A protein has these predicted regions:
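Glycine-rich beta-strand-centered segment in the early N-terminal region that forms part
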Residues: 19-34, 45-92, 132-134
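Mid-domain Rossmann-like dinucleotide-binding core that forms the NAD(H)/NADP(H) cofactor-binding site
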Residues: 135-181
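Short Gly/Pro-enriched turn/cap motifs at secondary-structure boundaries
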Residues: 7, 18-19, 50-55, 108-113, ...
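Cytochrome P450 core scaffold surrounding the K-helix E-X-X-R motif
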Residues: 39-43
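Cysteine-cluster motifs in flexible loop/terminal segments that predominantly coordinate metals
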Residues: 37, 71, 80-129, 133
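Residues that mark the start of a beta-strand
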Residues: 2, 26-28, 163
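Residue-level recognition of beta-strand termini and adjacent short loop/turns
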Residues: 8-10, 23
């Protein structure tokens, strides 16, 4: 399969790589759309880590459902790129982002788990979400950044009538402004 990886400061390289196979029940996805996150830009600007295949805001079609019996080939899905332990206090309370293991094998954020700047990617089966009919692949890529924005707004405990300052006009900031309304 074709993929794009970091090859140096502000440099990418288009290369061939083996298509991922299901490991530990992971779901294999034919990537149809992938967002560009601010963290992707930081990696590109720094040129580190060399070899990283970025892309953690993605949507596509199931080609191998792995251990998910409720998924079938052809289902439209998106995935959460994280890899929480599901055992610690943070995970047990649903706060996966605070798990110390969440980012160790994150899709498109670690050298161990290639992201969606590729024709195919893999994702933990418990982190896959079906895309409702009528939602485009491009819109489905916004699930992850939407969750980040919504979480930030919820942490702020904004009430009706509050004045809110959001610093940053990127996608996270714009979504936070919408959620804060």
């Amino acid at each position: 399969m074709k993929c794009v990886s970091i090859s140096g400061v502000k440099k990418f390289v288009l290369k061939e790589k083996n298509k991922p196979i299901s490991r530990d029940g992971s779901v294999i996805i034919d990537v149809k759309s992938c967002g560009i996150c601010g963290s992707d830009i930081h990696y590109w600007l720094s040129g580190q880590p060399v070899g990283l295949i970025m892309g953690h805001e993605f949507a596509g079609v199931v080609v191998d459902s792995g251990s998910r019996s409720d998924l079938k080939k052809g289902d439209r899905v998106t995935g959460l790129p994280i890899s929480p332990c599901m055992k610690c206090d943070a995970c047990c309370s649903g706060n996966y982002q605070y798990c110390s293991e969440t980012w160790t094998d994150a899709v498109g954020l670690s050298l161990d788990n290639s992201g969606a700047y590729a024709e195919y990617t893999s994702c933990r089966p418990d982190m896959i979400r079906k895309i409702p009919n009528g939602v485009s692949y491009d819109a489905a890529c916004m699930v992850e950044p939407s969750a980040v924005s919504l979480h930030a707004v919820n942490l702020a405990s904004i009430k009706i009538g509050d004045t809110v300052l959001i610093i940053g006009g990127g996608i996270i900031g714009l979504m936070a402004a919408e959620f804060a309304k």
